[in-house]
Amino acid sequence: MKALLQRVGAARVEVGGEIVGSIDRGLLVLVGVEPEDGERCAAKMLHKLLNYRVFGDDEGKMNRSLLDVQGGLLLVSQFTLAANTRSGLRPSFSSAAPPAQGEAVFEHLVKLAREAYPQVATGRFGADMQVHLVNDGPVTFLLES
């Protein structure tokens, strides 16, 4: 599983002009599921997302997690993160999980997140989404589990 984590001042996801998920200060996370990923991988990634220290403390050091600052968590599925881009000029998606598996693992991640944390929003799996964000920093990390 790959998760592109971005610290944001605000973010929202629209589908067909309708806002389907939004947060204020927090983390926007684009999630790509790979064939070997399952429920255990989703649990491990959620632990990282909630505890990864990307927010500044009183001295400006990245010592605070999402749990510490009580920000929002916006999870958005993005199968293109799992693409193989090592050769050629066109990405290969053979390294991405099949759609049914990708949806099941992503939805399990969302379920775990909602059970563990009160401020969770999502995009819509498989939809053509427009993602709007105010990237804070910018601070962006690619997490893998």
Curated annotation (Swiss-Prot):
InterPro entries to which the protein is assigned, alphabetical: Daa-tRNA_deacyls_DTD, DTD-like_sf
EC numbers on record: 3.1.1.96
Reaction equation(s) it catalyzes: glycyl-tRNA(Ala) + H2O = tRNA(Ala) + glycine + H(+); a D-aminoacyl-tRNA + H2O = a tRNA + a D-alpha-amino acid + H(+)
Alphabetized UniProt keyword annotations: Cytoplasm, Hydrolase, RNA-binding, tRNA-binding
Superkingdom to which the source organism belongs: Bacteria
Entries under Pfam families matching the protein: Tyr_Deacylase
Subcellular location(s) of the protein: Cytoplasm
GO cellular component, one term: cytoplasm
Major subcellular site: cytoplasm
KW Transferase (keyword) present: no
A GO biological process held by the record: tRNA metabolic process
Any GO molecular function: tRNA binding
Motif (Gly-cisPro motif, important for rejection of L-amino acids): 137-138
PANTHER family: D-AMINOACYL-TRNA DEACYLASE 1 (PTHR10472:SF5), D-TYROSYL-TRNA TYR DEACYLASE (PTHR10472)
Subunit structure: Homodimer.
Domain observations: A Gly-cisPro motif from one monomer fits into the active site of the other monomer to allow specific chiral rejection of L-amino acids.
Family matches, as NCBIfam families: D-aminoacyl-tRNA deacylase
Function description: An aminoacyl-tRNA editing enzyme that deacylates mischarged D-aminoacyl-tRNAs. Also deacylates mischarged glycyl-tRNA(Ala), protecting cells against glycine mischarging by AlaRS. Acts via tRNA-based rather than protein-based catalysis; rejects L-amino acids rather than detecting D-amino acids in the active site. By recycling D-aminoacyl-tRNA to D-amino acids and free tRNA molecules, this enzyme counteracts the toxicity associated with the formation of D-aminoacyl-tRNA entities in vivo and helps enforce protein L-homochirality.
Entry similarity comment: Belongs to the DTD family.
Name of the featured protein: D-aminoacyl-tRNA deacylase
Organism of provenance: Pseudomonas aeruginosa (strain ATCC 15692 / DSM 22644 / CIP 104116 / JCM 14847 / LMG 12228 / 1C / PRS 101 / PAO1)
